A protein has these predicted regions:
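Inter-lobe coupling linker of SF2 helicases/translocases
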Residues: 27-72, 79-81, 85, 92-122, ...
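Conserved Helicase C-terminal RecA-like lobe
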Residues: 264-448, 454-456
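Conserved segment of the helicase C-terminal RecA-like domain
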Residues: 489-504
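Conserved helix-turn-beta segment of the N-terminal RecA-like "Helicase ATP-binding" lobe
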Residues: 1-22, 33-36, 195-199
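A short beta-strand element within the Helicase C-terminal
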Residues: 187-190, 460-474, 499-502
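A solvent-exposed, charged loop/short amphipathic helix patch at secondary-structure junctions
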Residues: 60-79, 136-150, 372-399
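Catalytic acidic motif of RecA-like/P-loop NTPases
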Residues: 47-48, 129-135, 180, 456-457, ...
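Walker B catalytic acidic pair
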Residues: 126-127, 472
Length: 504
């Protein structure tokens, strides 16, 4: 990004911070440099933004506001004789926030410069959807699409946005994202809280419950059970009212551009859905999953022994290759994995003259020690903690006894593809190693790159010779599928026609 910025603005004085700059021993020097230097721009990574602290006073004020909102919600529920379960859930959230507040008030403010002291008057956030898990205080319970989980990095960004709003009159924050909504339209409220909080507050819509009461309606309907063996009732925000008014409000801060309006020079894409029939053995295992789900729903199973999360995980593994459940199972030639190998080998041979490249996306059966791996050369304890937190919370990758990546690589080599032309994104442990790897893919030296959504879904610019992407499994969020496609349907691709294979 630093190089691109300098090309666009040759006379600009920019500072590109490195991971080493953000190590604990070096931060104070970096912050002093930012505060005293005459920089036009300071470029940092998402994880580094959270290492620039916000003042203790602002943190206390924000947490106290959350507590006050929850107390108000509890009182309203009590007056309306609301569910005791809802009241207890909100009370647990209040106690958790109170603990944070007590800890914060007891902590001593060190001499580290805060975000407010650095002289920053504009904040540009690329891939802004990564901060969508902002705290939500709501009385709604068991409504699909509404998450009560909150991430620290989202809260940290919110605090910085509020400071810049105060300093610039609501003109200090710019978000850029191709996927502002990844799961539900309710995420629109989060984006509006970041970018036009004062407007929401002036109209009494800063609280989610008020906002959804105006623009959304709850609907209960039957949906397929996770195990696929029947249906169950599910409540979600399914009907929306006043959409023209809502979009008018959002467009006060949103400049929306679609691929059609931008007319970008990107290749045409042919989407191929590769449908693989389930084997009798897989069908038998699916029935076992259904039986396990029935036992869990009947309360006959200790949740530490079996639960719906385990069933969902086993179902994903079974759909890709039964060997992910048990490596001793037969390697059936007609699994998604083997069909993918056939397509990759065929395209590799057909495009050998131009040395065109391919990407295989797979979040299951990643290389051993890659899932949740935290220890990376050159990073300090905070970096390790961040990585562990991401791995534990998102669980985007799953390591199994059977390694999908190794199986694919071995079969491609057996079909004549040189081993040195195949690489894993997981082998790039540092930013420099990743940059070197991407250079080799762009040049065609490496022609098959395997990786996961988490490691390769964003920030991967290897499109120059990319002719095909293979979605071996389907990620949890629709937005992740868009991010995968964005690796190939991208400016700078020399190919006019490309393919995306999705194996089901």
């Amino acid at each position: 990004i630093g190089d691109d910025f300098q090309k666009l603005y040759p006379g600009a004085n920019i500072l590109v911070a490195t991971k080493k700059d953000f190590q604990k021993a070096n931060r104070q020097q970096l912050f002093a440099k930012i505060a005293t230097g005459n920089y036009d721009a300071v470029i940092i990574g998402h994880s580094q933004l959270g290492k620039i602290p916000v003042s203790k006073e602002r943190q206390v004020m924000t947490i106290q506001t959350q507590i006050d909102d929850i107390l108000q919600g509890i009182e309203e529920l009590k007056k309306s004789e609301g569910s005791k379960f809802q009241i207890k859930a909100m009370e647990r959230t209040r106690k958790s926030l109170q603990k944070q507040l007590d800890k914060l008030e007891k902590a001593n403010q060190d001499d580290t410069l805060t975000f407010e002291q650095l002289g920053i008057d504009r904040l540009f956030i690329d891939e802004a959807h990564e901060f969508k898990n902002l705290f939500v205080a709501t009385k709604l319970q068991n409504v699909a699409g509404i998450s009560n989980s909150a991430s620290q990095k989202a809260l940290d960004l919110f605090l910085k946005c509020r400071y810049l709003d105060e300093k610039t009159g609501g003109k200090g924050v710019i978000f850029a994202t191709g996927t502002p909504l990844s799961n539900s339209i309710t995420e629109l409220h989060t984006m509006m809280r970041y970018l036009e909080y004062d407007f929401l507050r002036d109209h009494g819509l800063q609280h989610f419950d008020n906002w959804v009461a105006v623009f959304g309606e709850q609907k209960t309907d039957y949906e397929l059970k996770p195990a696929g063996n029947g249906f169950k009732e599910r409540t979600r925000i399914a009907n929306y009212t006043g959409l023209p008014e809502l979009m008018s409000m959002f467009k006060q801060v949103a400049d929306i551009r679609t691929a059609d309006t931008l007319k970008l020079d990107v290749p045409d894409c042919d989407y191929q859905v590769v449908q693989v029939e389930a084997t009798p053995f897989q069908q038998e295992l699916v029935q076992e999953l259904a039986d396990r789900a029935d036992a869990i729903n009947a309360g006959n199973v200790d949740p530490t022994i079996d639960n719906m999360l385990k069933i969902t995980s086993d179902g994903r593994k079974l759909g890709l290759d039964p060997r992910l459940i048990d490596p001793s199972f037969e390697d059936n030639p007609d699994t998604k994995l083997n069909r993918c190998v056939e397509n990759v080998a065929r395209i590799h041979a057909e495009t050998a003259e131009d040395r065109l490249t391919q990407i295989i996306f797979c979040d299951l059966g990643v290389p051993h020690k890659a899932a949740g791996e935290a220890e990376v050369e050159g990073e300090d304890a905070d970096d390790v903690k961040d990585k562990k937190s991401i791995a534990e919370v998102e669980s985007l990758e799953e390591e199994c006894d059977f390694c999908v990546y190794d199986d694919i690589r071995d079969k491609l080599i057996a079909r004549g593809i040189p081993a040195e032309e195949i690489a894993y994104i997981h082998d790039a442990k540092t930013e420099q190693q990743k940059a070197d790897l991407f250079d080799k893919v762009r040049s065609g030296e490496i022609r098959v790159l395997l990786g996961s959504t988490a490691k390769m879904g964003t920030g991967t610019n290897v499109q120059k010779k990319l002719i095909a992407v293979h979605d071996l499994d389907i990620p949890w969020r629709p937005a992740d599928l868009e991010q995968r496609a964005g690796r190939i349907i991208r400016q700078g691709n020399e190919n006019k026609q490309v393919q995306i294979f999705r194996y089901v």
